[in-house]
Amino acid sequence: AIREAREILPEMPFHFHQGRMRFDQPGYQALREYIQLCPQSPWVSIHLAPLPALITIPALRWKLFLPQPSPTGSIRRFIQQVKKLQLRFKRPVILENMPALHPRKYRFESEPETIWQVQEATGCKLLLDLAHARIAAEARRMDVHAYIKALPLEHVVQMHLAGTRRDERSGRLYDAHQPLSREDYELLDWTLARAAPEWITLEYFREDPAALSDQLQRLAALIQA
C-alpha cells in the first residue's frame, strides 16, 4: 500500500510507523524495505510491547485471553530485542506506549514503571499515544492525567491522536481511530503543556473528508495557539 501511495504522491514525505515489531530476519527485512520507501522517517517507531504475539494475537482477534507470561522475563526479553534492533538500524528507535488488552490481565505491559524501565534501559525516546493512555488509565480506574504524568514525558518526541469509542458489549474504551472528541482535544491541550513532541500524528482510519478536514483545522488551531 505504501509503494502504491508513493507512486501516486511522489513528492509527499511519508513517515512509516512499524507498530508491533517482528524481531526476526523476515521482520528486519520488511522494516528495511519500508524505510527505503519512507526515507524521510526520522525514527524507527515500534510498540513498547513486551507481551509476546502468542498472547496479543488471540486477545485482539478472538478475545481469547491466555495465561499471563512472566512480567520480568517478558520485559527483559523485550529490552534485549530493542537493543538488537538499535544495532541493526542507524535511525533512532522510539517506543509507543500500549493500551490495556484487558482490565485485569497483562497490565504490566502498560504500567508506567514498565515504560520507564524500558526507556531507561534502551535510551529510546517515547511516542506517546493519548488514546492508548486513556484506555490504560481507565483499566486501572485511574485519572488519565495522573497516568500520563507518571510517564517519561521529557522523552516524548512524537504523539499519536485517535478517537476512542466504547465497546457495545463490554462498555470498555477501545482505540477506534474515529474522529476526535472534545475530551481528546482537551487532553491534547493539557499534555502539550507538559511535553514537547516534534511530531503529532492524527490516526484517523475512516474516509469522511469533512470529518478529516474538521479535525485537521481544530488541531492546527490548538497547536498554533
Where are these regions (language model features)?
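Hydrophobic faces of well-ordered beta-strands that scaffold small-molecule active sites
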Residues: 1, 8-18, 42-46, 93-96, ...
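Acidic-and-aromatic substrate-binding clefts and catalytic sites of carbohydrate-active enzymes
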Residues: 1-5, 20-28, 101-109, 134-141, ...
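Active-site beta-loop-alpha junctions enriched in small/polar residues
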Residues: 17-23, 47-51, 98-100, 131-135, ...
